[in-house]
């Protein structure tokens, strides 16, 4: 994804990348988010990992970053199920949940 593709999207569109980080130009994504070319984005991967603290994407309030956890496979499916069950039990007991996104920090 690059600037031309972002500008061809509807301004109400949300971009999600859980695939390969190098398929998205981060500076172009930051520009698209900042100038309103798209409504928002969520990325689990980036061409540079971890995303540098000074990168412009961290200033985009319409972005959510997850720590490269979107994956596929029997091992990850089992772990995902464990986390869901554990968080459900924690919720019932009134305990803090694991892996909660801090909406203020957007990750």
Region spans (language model):
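Beta-loop-alpha module in the N-terminal Rossmann-like domain of NAD(P)-dependent dehydrogenases
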Residues: 1-4, 22-24
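Rossmann-like dinucleotide-binding domain for NAD(H)/NADP(H)
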Residues: 12-107
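A short, gly/pro- and small-residue-rich
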Residues: 2-5, 84-86
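Hydrophobic anchor residues at the C-terminal helix/turn of individual leucine-rich repeat
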Residues: 5-6, 57
């Amino acid at each position: 994804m690059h600037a031309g593709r972002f500008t061809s999207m509807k301004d109400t569109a949300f971009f999600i990348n859980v695939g390969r980080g190098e398929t998205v130009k981060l500076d172009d994504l930051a520009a698209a988010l900042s100038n309103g070319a798209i409504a928002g984005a969520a990325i689990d991967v980036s061409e540079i990992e971890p995303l540098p603290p000074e990168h412009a994407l961290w200033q985009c309030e319409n972005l959510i970053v997850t720590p490269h956890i979107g994956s596929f496979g029997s091992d990850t499916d089992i772990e995902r199920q464990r986390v869901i069950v554990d968080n459900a039990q924690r919720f019932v007991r009134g305990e803090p949940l694991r892996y909660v996104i801090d909406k203020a920090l957007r990750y």
